[in-house]
């Protein structure tokens, strides 16, 4: 029984090859399929990202089986082209690729295979094996990125110039008002001082000999930090804030102060005197009335 079932190799089986030939004869393929391609000149690794993205769009989800199936057909064709002696003979038949993908993609198999084959033809004509479409897309992407970078630089430069102009106007107004009031030196003197301070900073940064006006010069400990080492704009902008203001001295009430009672309540002196005289007057009137009433009662008695 073991020798009853006998089979043949796939190359010797004529059933499927005949069916494929009949299907190829009955199917109408695009004219670009007739172009022969040398697969040794094609960079397959560049095409793989596009193949995966395009198949996901057509299927609607990520199907690794179909993606790896297409990768396998391309890699097999490249290996076959390396052993082939003829450079004009194509080792990858796009018609077979379309028929193999019909079961997965159905009506989208023709569109996908035609796009893939056009990219393969373009890659074979390039010295780096990259399709011309990919090169143009990359150049366009680089150009857009460059435009965005330049736009951001221009925007930042505009903002910086605007802030510098506003700061310059503010300082100019402040300096002019100070000069009119005679509280500071002229702007030319200040600019010269700033120039010397900047020169000292550059010399100290690169390790040159320190300036006599530098904050790191050899001075006593109490005089080591020169006033010009601090930010002059910050100092001049906020120097008026710490000036003593002309305030009226606050008076704290005590019991010994005149015009306040023992509870700290203040009363006007005139009001107090008038109030006192009023009370004294009425007290005298009350005493007189009481004395008259007492005398009347005595007379009546």
From Swiss-Prot:
Disulphide bonds in the chain: none
Keywords: mRNA processing, Nucleus, Phosphoprotein, RNA-binding
MF (Gene Ontology): RNA binding
Annotated signal sequence range: none
GO BP annotation list: mRNA cis splicing, via spliceosome
InterPro entries: PWI_dom, PWI_dom_sf, Ser/Arg_repetitive_matrix
UniProt main location, coarse: nucleus
Name of the molecule in the record: PWI domain-containing protein C825.05c
Superkingdom of the source species: Eukaryota
Compositional bias per record (Polar residues), positions renumbered to this chain: 290-301
Alphabetized Gene3D superfamilies for the sequence: PWI domain (1.20.1390.10)
Domain annotation PWI: ranges: 26-137
One GO CC term, this protein: spliceosomal complex
Keyword Nucleus: yes
Compositional bias annotation for Basic and acidic residues: 145-182, 189-205, 215-229, 254-289
Modification Phosphoserine occurs at: 86, 199, 291
Biased composition (Basic residues): 244-253
Segments of this protein annotated with the region Disordered: 145-301
Subcellular location as annotated: Nucleus
Organism: Schizosaccharomyces pombe (strain 972 / ATCC 24843) (Fission yeast)
């Amino acid at each position: 029984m073991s020798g009853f079932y006998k089979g043949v190799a796939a190359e010797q089986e004529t059933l499927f090859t005949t069916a494929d030939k009949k299907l190829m004869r009955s199917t109408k393929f695009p004219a670009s399929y007739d172009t022969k391609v040398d697969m040794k000149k094609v960079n397959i690794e560049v095409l793989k990202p596009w193949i995966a993205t395009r198949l996901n769009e057509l299927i609607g989800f990520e199907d690794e089986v179909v993606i790896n199936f297409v990768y396998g057909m391309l890699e097999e064709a490249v290996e076959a082209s390396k052993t082939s002696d003829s450079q004009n003979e194509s080792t990858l038949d796009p018609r077979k690729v379309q028929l193999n993908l019909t079961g997965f993609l159905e009506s989208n198999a023709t569109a996908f295979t035609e796009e893939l084959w056009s990219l393969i033809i373009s890659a074979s004509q390039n010295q780096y094996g990259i399709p011309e479409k990919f090169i143009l897309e990359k150049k366009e992407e680089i150009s857009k990125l460059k435009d965005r970078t330049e736009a951001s630089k221009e925007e930042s430069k505009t903002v910086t110039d605007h802030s510098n102009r506003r700061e310059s106007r503010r300082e100019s107004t402040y300096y002019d008002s100070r000069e009119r009031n005679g509280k500071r030196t002229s702007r030319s003197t200040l600019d010269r001082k700033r120039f010397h301070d900047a020169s000292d900073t550059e010399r100290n940064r690169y390790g040159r000999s320190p300036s006599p006006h530098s904050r790191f010069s050899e001075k006593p400990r109490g005089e080591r930090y020169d006033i010009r080492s601090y930010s002059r704009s910050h100092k001049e902008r906020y120097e008026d804030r710490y000036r003593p203001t002309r305030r009226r001295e606050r008076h704290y009430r005590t019991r010994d102060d005149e015009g306040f009672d023992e509870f700290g309540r203040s009363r006007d002196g005139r009001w107090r005197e008038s109030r006192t005289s009023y009370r004294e007057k009425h007290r005298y009137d009350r005493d007189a009335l009481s004395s008259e009433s007492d005398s009347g009662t005595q007379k009546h008695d």
